[in-house]
Amino acid sequence: MQPLVLFATSEMYPFSKSGGLGDVLGALPLTLHRMGVRTAVVTPFYGRLKTAEYGIHLTMSDIPVGYPWGPITADVYEADFHGMPVYFISRGEYFDRRFYYNDYKGDYFDNCERFVFFCRAAASMCRRLGEAPAVVHAHDWQTALLPALLYHWRRYDSFWEDTRTVMTIHNLAFQGRFSSRLFENCGLPPQAWSMDGVEFYGDFNLLKGGIAYADKVTTVSPSYAREITTPEFGCGLEGILRRRTHALHGILNGADYDIWKPEDDRFLPCTYSPDRLAGKQRCKRALLDELGLDSSLMERPVLGFIGRLRDQKGIDLLIDNIAQLMERQVGVVILGEGSLEYEAQVLHLMEEYKGRLCARVEYTEDLAHRIQAGADIFLMPSRYEPCGLTQIYALRFGTPPVASSLGGLRDTITPWPAPDATGFTFDDVSPAGFLNAIMQAVNLWENDHTAWAGMVRRAMEVSFTWEKAAVQYLDIYQQLGFVPAGE
């Protein structure tokens, strides 16, 4: 039997998704599977899962998950996802909730307990299956306990002695930081409570443990891998990341172009391609009609923003510039949810500029596609952006982005006025810096239709495939001794 790469994640599209993590885990394991690598995914069984639609069925019952006070049990469900097994860890009181990590009151009080349970249950599932994976690939703080556990277990447990681990950081700002009293129930030995382990200013830090104990650490763009070793972007973990520089790699995310493909997109009223751009104009007209925006905006640029309404995504920079943008007679479309304060502000602006600005305080996949297709310019003023996927989608949909020049945005956008420009970037992440970059884009749209059309076509032809990323991840696995079939 071929060696197995097991992906552990709290989200996987189409089963669960709150952001880019779900997209990545819906694509990377499957891409490797199609390359001939034996892969599987383990993820929580959330209450909103559509079991009938995806053929999810119970495959293991009452798996014991050990704790200091005794075992509790988990059930495991399974689905066949294009020939690749996906396992779902089920325990109702932990995962049968409306949201994944928080509600409008804040983070769930038992998030540490929930995801410690998930990690330990995933390990118990492997024992029940009778196979230790060659590589366990963990993603973000929710699964970061697994590399720490396996580092210690494989020293005395022959079942795990050949398993190696990879820890991928999708967003360093979310670390899984909890009270020190919760450490005693996680299953790690006392020596893991140290500055070189999971201890972080007196707290229990799950992501720090994953970084400390994984055999390899990756993040989702080369620029972000460099940034997180600095105090500005390291979120307090720059020290341990610098110590682990030899094991740290930046691999740019890909895009699932089977889903984000304007030539063949079930969510669009009209398809189009670099050689058939008339369809994009029809998508714009349909978007204006759908959102109740003035038809006169067909003659003006429409700016689209899709993202969480939080400081990280720079929504406040957009809000601060709305009055100036309205003076330039542009349209603005906002899609996303986040802090109640920002939600209220964008809804107020929609009332103030009715017909010119539309804000939908939600996230729906179909509308996201139609905004990418119907907008002329895409806005992404992030204060930090590990990789970003929406700007990659915007490029493929021929909607040149205006984005801050950092992280994955720097790695994916060639800025104007370069001859091969695909968008616009800015270094001064402030309202003035953002507005200046927007006005560059608006001026080009207004005054040089030939240059704009050329940028649109170049953007659509840029390719960030998961195949490119998967080859780099496979190289990481092989550095750890993983030998794929046929080699």
From Swiss-Prot:
One of its GO terms (molecular function) is alpha-1,4-glucan glucosyltransferase (ADP-glucose donor) activity. GO terms for biological process: glycogen biosynthetic process. Pathway: Glycan biosynthesis; glycogen biosynthesis. It catalyses: [(1->4)-alpha-D-glucosyl](n) + ADP-alpha-D-glucose = [(1->4)-alpha-D-glucosyl](n+1) + ADP + H(+). The keyword Electron transport does not apply. Its EC number is 2.4.1.21. InterPro entries: Glyco_trans_1, GS/SS, Starch_synth_cat_dom. It holds the Pfam family Glycos_transf_1. Keywords: Glycogen biosynthesis, Glycosyltransferase, Transferase. Synthesizes alpha-1,4-glucan chains using ADP-glucose. Belongs to the glycosyltransferase 1 family. Bacterial/plant glycogen synthase subfamily. ADP-alpha-D-glucose binds at K17. The lineage of its organism: Bacteria, Pseudomonadati, Thermodesulfobacteriota, Desulfovibrionia, Desulfovibrionales. This is Glycogen synthase.
